[in-house]
């Protein structure tokens, strides 16, 4: 199952999920999110969700989600960090 399918299922079933997320700067963190919806402002490649650990709503780019509930999704792409491009 692709990550988009897992996210879509979580949106439809209103599930709380644990994600591992890589920020644009390359920092990786894990958090629980709930109340997940697709972002109307940023389009279908982003979700809006409530982070339970910091008790705030946040926007997440779907392609930066590396794991959902412990399941890894391998993606090979180039990510620009600063002035350098790094393979992730």
Task: Give a label for each model feature.
Residues 1-88:
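Core beta-strand-centered patch of the WYL/Sm-like small regulatory domain
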């Amino acid at each position: 199952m692709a990550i988009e399918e897992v996210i879509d299922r979580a949106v439809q079933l209103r599930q709380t999920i644990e994600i591992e997320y890589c920020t644009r700067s390359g920092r990786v963190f894990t958090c629980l999110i709930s109340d997940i919806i697709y972002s109307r402002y940023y389009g279908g490649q982003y979700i809006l969700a409530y982070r339970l650990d910091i008790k705030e709503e946040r926007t997440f780019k779907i392609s930066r989600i590396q794991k959902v509930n412990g399941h890894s999704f391998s993606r090979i792409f180039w990510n620009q960090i600063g002035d350098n491009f790094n393979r992730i």
